[in-house]
Amino acid sequence: MILKKDMSTENDIYQEIRPYNDAEIAPAIQRLIDDEEFISAILSHKFSHLPALLRGLVSPLVKMFLKNRWGKLDSVDAVQIEVEKYLDKALDTTSDGVTFEGLDKLDKNTSYLFISNHRDIAMDPALVNYGLHHSQHQTMRIAIGDNLLRKPCATELMKINKSFIVKRSAKAPREMMKALGLLSSYIKHSLETSNSIWIAQKEGRAKDGNDFTDPAIIKMIQLEGRKRKMAFSEYVKSLKIVPVAISYEYDPCDLAKANELYQKATQGEYQKSEFEDIESIVKGITATKAEFK
């Protein structure tokens, strides 16, 4: 894996949204191991067949396992290698293979803005990173919505895995413009410091399979270009945009997506349960997907 230097924390205007750097990895992992909600979530997923009392007795063993497995991770690249091991296992057990096209057209010494269709919350960027890594490219920084970060442990997990935060919760016009301006600036900053970026072509997954790029994404990206007084065409060219199309033979979340569309069509709205997005992430990783392309 190609190593890159971390961004300095001095005068770090992006600290609130950026992923963790090397110096922040080990403390973040320790916070995860000490987070009872995180441990409880693992117990509920891995040991759901056990009574609650017995799951509690297993908790110290889970912490010991995590400490042994993750305790030596002290850099962004070390985390990426560990994530690849989990992804290898997931792909071996839930898919019939992955086919990549176009990676040979990319320059290993160039940073790109990957704009992708969106089928699965976690697997979409994970698959692109998987292809990049196995082609000796640097892995990307990943844009994620703050709607996925309702728990501190979720924030820790995402930020140790090169994810930066898109503040979808910002609603007031001034707050929204400030958040979008910072996001646009961070994307350009990342590209200029040799870090590729992954971002979905529109907010949320395309639950009906209709892939199109939301003009709001392009407007957001261009905010930094306007600030620099660059022509639209000149600025977009400087971003080195790479369109990405991902297809799944089977979508593990297809029934949930269909139900959401049905509820919106018949009731006019759909209310997500508190942990529905997290459940979708887990199902997307662990359920059968057959072939990817």
Name every feature range the model reports, one short phrase each.
Residues 2-112, 118-129, 133, 155, ...:
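Membrane-anchoring hydrophobic helices of lipid-metabolizing enzymes
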Residues 83-293:
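Soluble catalytic domains of membrane acyltransferases
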